[in-house]
Amino acid sequence: MTTRLLQGKKGLITGIANNMSISWAIAQLAKKHGAELWFTYQSEALEKRVKPLAEEIGCNFISELDVTDQKSISNLFNDIKEKWNSFDFLLHGMAFANKNELKGRYVDTSLENFYNSLHISCYSLLELSRSAETLMHDGGSILTLTYYGAEKVIPNYNIMGVAKAALEASVKYLANDMGENNIRVNAISAGPIKTLASSAISDFSTMLKFHASTAPLKRNITQEDVGGAAVYLFSELSKGVTGEIHYVDCGYNIIGSSKLL
């Protein structure tokens, strides 16, 4: 690789659950482009999956992060300040919903699931961005992951669609708040892709087939497709881009009707 777009940059990567995670694909490509990375994991159970991945690409920093625990967030950023002093980009890659409610009717969403889904999937972006802002001394890039179900009704996506809609609105408001410090905030709206999280969605295989048959490129996206877009949004190539929802969905979002009968 002759051009290393992230050479000399440091980045915090959240949301890795296993080697099928979009966050992992982004991390791999960021590393290839010269970035020094810091991984987080949600729990001890996930540490067993994430630690070998960190070792695989030479990531020397890995920390537990529970975004529902303010102390956990503070500990992470205190460690980053101590080890790095500052850093350049953040990937917000986590989301949550009770899998038992990723089917049936949205109107049956429980209050507990509504609260937890919005807290982990959306409010955590605010908390991480607030902490990251103090350590992005020379500006930076914050990136999150969303999906078309934030804009249009997708069967069984339910509360996650509402959480992603809130996330996308938050991207715009955060971009406005943080722009004065030369911090850019964007989201990638990725097409459906097989991950640990997506496996919880009822009839997900049907969603994949419909997407591939409808999208102009006639295929589903890959983790590498998203990774390439992420590297662009982390790099100086996108220094004039903020507050954007960047589609990586093989063109699916432009289609009004797949076929006329």
Curated annotation (Swiss-Prot):
Pathway: Lipid metabolism; fatty acid biosynthesis. It comes from the Bacteria. CDD domains: ENR_SDR. Its EC number is 1.3.1.9. One of its GO terms (biological process) is fatty acid elongation. Keywords: Fatty acid biosynthesis, Fatty acid metabolism, Lipid biosynthesis, Lipid metabolism, NAD, Oxidoreductase. SUPFAM superfamilies: NAD(P)-binding Rossmann-fold domains (SSF51735). Substrate binds at residue 97. The active site is at residues 147, 157. One of its GO terms (molecular function) is identical protein binding. NAD(+) binds at residues 15, 21-22, 42, 66-67, 94, 164, 193-197. InterPro entries: Enoyl-ACP_Rdtase_NADH, NAD(P)-bd_dom_sf, SDR_fam. It catalyses: a 2,3-saturated acyl-[ACP] + NAD(+) = a (2E)-enoyl-[ACP] + NADH + H(+). PANTHER family: ENOYL-[ACYL-CARRIER-PROTEIN] REDUCTASE, ENOYL-[ACYL-CARRIER-PROTEIN] REDUCTASE [NADH], CHLOROPLASTIC. Catalyzes the reduction of a carbon-carbon double bond in an enoyl moiety that is covalently linked to an acyl carrier protein (ACP). Involved in the elongation cycle of fatty acid which are used in the lipid metabolism. Belongs to the short-chain dehydrogenases/reductases (SDR) family. FabI subfamily. Homotetramer. This is Enoyl-[acyl-carrier-protein] reductase [NADH] FabI. It comes from Rickettsia typhi (strain ATCC VR-144 / Wilmington). The lineage of its organism: Bacteria, Pseudomonadati, Pseudomonadota, Alphaproteobacteria, Rickettsiales.
